[in-house]
UniProtKB/Swiss-Prot annotation:
Gene that encodes the chain: gatE
InterPro entries in the record: Asn/Gln-tRNA_amidoTrfase_suB/E (IPR017959), Asn/Gln-tRNA_Trfase_suB/E_cat (IPR006075), Asn/Gln_amidotransferase (IPR018027), Asn/Gln_tRNA_amidoTrase-B-like (IPR003789), GAD-like_sf (IPR004115), GAD_dom (IPR029351), GatB_C_1 (IPR042114), GatB_Yqey_C_2 (IPR023168)
Pfam entry (one): GatB_Yqey
Keyword Nucleotide-binding: yes
Transmembrane segments: none
Oligomer status and interactors: Heterodimer of GatD and GatE.
A GO-annotated cellular component: cytoplasm
Lineage summary: Archaea, Methanobacteriati, Methanobacteriota, Thermococci, Thermococcales
UniProt similarity note: Belongs to the GatB/GatE family. GatE subfamily.
GO molecular function: aminoacyl-tRNA ligase activity; ATP binding; glutaminyl-tRNA synthase (glutamine-hydrolyzing) activity
Entry-linked PROSITE patterns: GATB
Species per Swiss-Prot/TrEMBL record: Thermococcus kodakarensis (strain ATCC BAA-918 / JCM 12380 / KOD1) (Pyrococcus kodakaraensis (strain KOD1))
Swiss-Prot/TrEMBL keywords: ATP-binding, Ligase, Nucleotide-binding, Protein biosynthesis
Source taxon at top rank: Archaea
Gene3D superfamilies with a match to the protein in the record: 1.10.10.410, GAD-like domain, GatB domain, N-terminal subdomain
Identification of the protein by name: Glutamyl-tRNA(Gln) amidotransferase subunit E
Length: 629
C-alpha cells in the first residue's frame, strides 16, 4: 500500500502508551477484581487540585476543577472496601500482580528495578475517589526490534485502574467503584516510531508479551492504547482510547493530516498578518437581529431568556470552514472546546444555514464591522454561559495563529480525533507516603526471569507440532486469546482439531449474527462437557452458542434440552432413518447407492445436532445396501 505522506520528510514521531488490566486480586486490597451492576451503597465527594512537590498545579487538573462538579460513587460490598472509599490506608501491593508486571518487563527486554516506589498521580475528574492514582515503575530500559529499527521502552509501570463511569450530567458525575484498584500494567515507548505501520508492529509485540503471561483480563475496556503523535513544526498530541490494533495506522495518518492542515491555516493567517493579540475578548449582543429567526436553536435560546452573542475573528474568513480531517473542520475544533458550556456554535463559513438567513448574516457582519477577510462566531445561550463558550472559541482561534496546540484528544471510531483536555503537565506526581518501598531481592528476580512464559508465536509453533492443527487455526486461537481455554479442553479429552474448529470457525461465524462476547469460557466448557458425556453431537455447538449469546443467563444444558439438541439413542436414530427411507423407497430402488447423498441430506435435516453424523451415515449406507441388494 502506498503511503499517503512521506513520514520521514515530515519528521513523524510516535510513542505508545499501553494499559492492560491484570487478572489478579485488586492492587491494594484483597478483594476480587470483578465488575458488577449490583449497587449496595452510594457516597459523594468533591475534589480539588493540590500542588506537586515542586509547588506547581497541573493544568489538566485545574481545568477539571473549574467545572465545579460533584461526584457520586456507587459501591458493592463484595467488590470494594474502605481502601477504595479512601477511608483506610492501602495494603499490599498484591504480590501476584507485582510478579506478573516483572514478567512483562523481562519479556520486553527491560531491566527490573531494585526497589519499587509507589507515587501519586493527581487525577481530579472523579475517576479516583482519593483524587490521585497510585503508580510505580517496576522495570526500565526495554526495547522492541522492528524492521524500521529498535523502539525503546523506558518504563514498565504497575498502577491501579480508575472507577468506571455510569452517567455524566452537567454538574454531577456518577461512577461505580468496582473497577477502582484493578491492577494495570502501563508500558510506555520512546517516540522512536516513525511510520504508522511500525506503531502497529510495536503495539502487537507488546500485546503478545502481555498475553503470554495468561494473567491479563480479556474483553471490552480491559486494554487501552494511547498514542503520542507529532510532526516537525507541529506539536505533541496525546490520543486516548485506541481500541483496535488495526486502527492505529489510520489514526496516526489522520493526526498527521490534521497537523499539516493546521500548519497550513497558521501560514495563511500569518500571510494575512493576524496576531494572537488581534483577537479581542469582546462580546457583541446580536439578539435583536434574531428576534424573528427561523433557526429553532436560536429561537429556543431567546425564548428561554438567553442571548445571542458574537465574537469577531479578524482575518479568519474561509479558514474556520477548512477541512482538517475528513468531515472535521477548524470550526469543529472550536465547537469541541465550547462544548463544556454549550451544545454547538455557528460560524460565518457555514452560514447561511440551519435556519439562519443571508439577511441575518449580513446584519451581524454590519454590526461587528467586519472586513472581507474577517469572520464571526455566534453562540445562543444564557449570557454568562455564552461568554464562557466564546472564550473557549477565542482561545482556540489564538492557538490556530500559533499552529498546532499540545492537547489530549479522544480517538473516534472513524479514525478521527476529538479534543478532550489540555495535555497534562509534569506537575502532578508526588510520593505515596502510605506504601513502604519494596526491595526486590536478586534471587527473586532471577526466579521470575528463569520461568518466563512462552510468547504467543512460540505457542503457535508448539500447537502446530504438538497438536497437528492448521497454522491459521493456531494463530487465531492465540491472537483471540482462546489458547488457554483450548489447552484446558484438550486436557479434558476433546480432540485438538475439534476444539480449535469450534473455538475459531464456529464462534467467528456466529459473530455476524449474535453478540458472541456474551458467551463465557464457562458456557464453552459446559457445552464440551455435554459432548464428552455423549449428550450432544458436535453439530449442536453452533445452535447452543447462538442461544447462549442471546441469553447468557442460561446454561448449555438448559439450551440443549429446550432446543431438543440432546442426542437420541441409536434405536431412535434408526427409527427416524427408517421413516426417511420409506418416504423415498422408489428413488432408492431406482438409484441404489446413488441415492445416498439425497437420503443422507434428508436424514440430517431431521437429526442434525441430535445424532452423530458418522452414525447416521453408517446406518443410511447399511439400509440402502439392504434395499439395493
Amino acid at each position: 500500500m502506498t503511503d499517503k505522506f512521506n513520514y520521514e520528510e515530515l519528521g513523524l514521531k510516535v510513542g505508545l502508551e499501553i494499559h492492560r488490566q491484570l487478572d489478579t486480586k485488586k492492587l491494594f486490597s484483597p478483594v476480587p477484581s470483578e465488575l458488577s451492576d449490583e449497587v449496595d451503597f452510594t457516597f459523594e465527594r468533591r475534589l480539588r487540585p493540590t500542588m506537586s512537590e515542586l509547588g506547581e498545579i497541573d493544568p489538566a487538573a485545574l481545568e477539571e476543577f473549574k467545572k465545579g462538579r460533584k461526584y457520586i460513587y456507587e459501591g458493592n460490598y463484595r467488590l470494594t472496601d474502605l481502601v477504595y472509599m479512601d477511608e483506610e490506608p492501602p495494603r499490599g501491593p498484591d504480590r501476584e500482580a507485582l510478579e506478573v508486571a516483572l514478567q512483562i518487563g523481562y519479556l520486553l527486554n527491560a531491566k527490573p528495578v531494585d526497589e519499587v516506589h509507589f507515587m501519586r498521580k493527581i487525577v481530579i475528574d472523579g475517576s479516583n475517589v482519593s483524587g490521585f492514582q497510585r503508580t510505580a515503575i517496576v522495570a526500565v530500559n526495554g526495547k522492541v526490534d522492528t524492521p524500521w529499527g529498535s523502539v525503546g521502552i523506558p518504563t514498565v509501570c504497575l498502577e491501579e485502574d480508575a472507577c468506571r463511569i455510569v452517567e455524566r450530567k452537567e454538574k454531577e458525575v456518577i461512577y461505580r467503584i468496582d473497577r477502582l484498584g484493578i491492577p494495570l500494567v502501563e508500558i510506555s515507548t520512546t517516540p522512536d516510531i516513525h511510520h504508522p505501520e511500525q506503531a502497529k508492529v510495536v503495539a502487537k509485540y507488546i500485546g503478545d508479551a502481555l498475553r503470554a503471561t495468561r494473567k491479563v483480563k480479556r474483553g471490552l475496556g480491559t486494554i487501552r492504547q494511547d498514542l503520542n503523535v507529532s510532526i516537525r513544526g507541529g506539536a505533541r498530541v496525546e490520543i486516548k482510547g485506541v481500541q483496535e490494533l488495526d486502527m492505529i495506522p489510520l489514526i496516526i495518518e489522520r493526526e498527521v493530516e490534521r497537523q499539516l492542515n493546521l500548519l497550513r491555516i497558521r501560514d495563511e493567517l500569518k500571510r494575512r498578518g493576524v496576531k494572537p493579540e488581534d483577537i479581542k475578548e469582546e462580546f457583541y449582543d446580536v439578539t435583536e437581529i434574531f428576534q424573528n429567526t427561523g433557526s429553532k436553536i436560536i429561537a429556543r435560546a431567546i425564548k428561554s431568556g438567553g442571548k445571542v452573542l458574537a465574537v469577531k475573528l479578524p482575518k479568519f474568513r474561509g479558514l474556520i470552514g477548512k477541512e482538517i480531517q475528513p468531515g472535521r473542520r477548524l470550526g469543529t475544533e472550536m465547537a469541541d472546546r465550547a462544548k463544556k458550556y454549550v451544545r454547538g456554535i455557528f460560524h460565518i463559513d457555514e452560514l447561511p444555514n440551519y435556519g439562519i438567513t443571508e439577511l441575518e448574516v449580513n446584519a451581524v457582519i454590519e454590526k461587528l464591522g467586519l472586513g472581507e477577510e474577517d469572520a464571526f462566531v455566534l453562540v445562543a445561550a444564557e449570557e454568562e454561559t455564552a461568554k464562557n463558550a466564546l472564550r473557549e472559541v477565542i482561545k482556540r482561534a489564538r492557538e490556530a495563529i500559533e499552529g498546532v496546540p499540545e492537547e489530549t484528544r479522544r480517538a473516534l471510531p472513524d479514525g478521527n480525533t476529538q479534543y478532550m483536555r489540555p495535555l497534562p503537565g509534569k506537575a502532578r506526581m508526588y510520593p505515596e507516603t502510605d506504601i513502604p518501598s519494596i526491595f526486590l531481592p536478586p534471587e527473586e528476580k532471577e526466579r521470575i526471569r528463569a520461568n518466563l512464559p512462552e510468547l504467543p508465536q512460540e505457542r503457535v509453533e508448539r500447537y502446530v507440532k504438538e497438536y497437528k492443527i492448521d497454522r491459521s487455526l493456531a494463530e487465531t486461537l492465540v491472537n483471540d486469546e482462546r489458547d488457554e481455554l483450548f489447552e484446558e479442553l484438550v486436557e479434558k479429552g476433546v480432540k485438538p482439531s475439534l476444539a480449535a474448529s469450534i473455538l475459531v470457525v464456529v464462534l467467528k461465524g456466529l459473530k455476524k449474527e449474535v453478540p458472541v462476547e456474551n458467551i463465557t469460557d464457562g458456557h464453552i466448557m459446559e457445552a464440551f462437557q455435554l459432548y464428552l458425556e455423549g449428550k450432544i453431537a458436535k453439530e449442536a455447538f453452533e445452535e447452543i452458542f447462538k442461544e447462549l449469546a442471546l441469553h447468557p443467563e442460561k446454561t448449555a444444558k438448559q439450551v440443549a434440552e429446550e432446543k431438543g439438541l440432546t442426542l437420541l439413542s441409536e434405536e431412535e436414530v434408526e427409527k427416524i432413518i427408517d421413516e426417511v427411507i420409506q418416504q423415498n423407497i422408489e428413488v432408492i430402488k431406482a438409484k441404489g447407492m446413488g441415492a445416498m447423498g439425497m437420503i443422507m441430506g434428508r436424514a440430517m435435516a431431521k437429526l442434525r445436532g441430535r445424532a452423530d453424523g458418522k452414525l447416521v451415515s453408517s446406518l443410511v449406507r447399511k439400509k440402502i445396501q439392504e434395499i439395493a441388494g
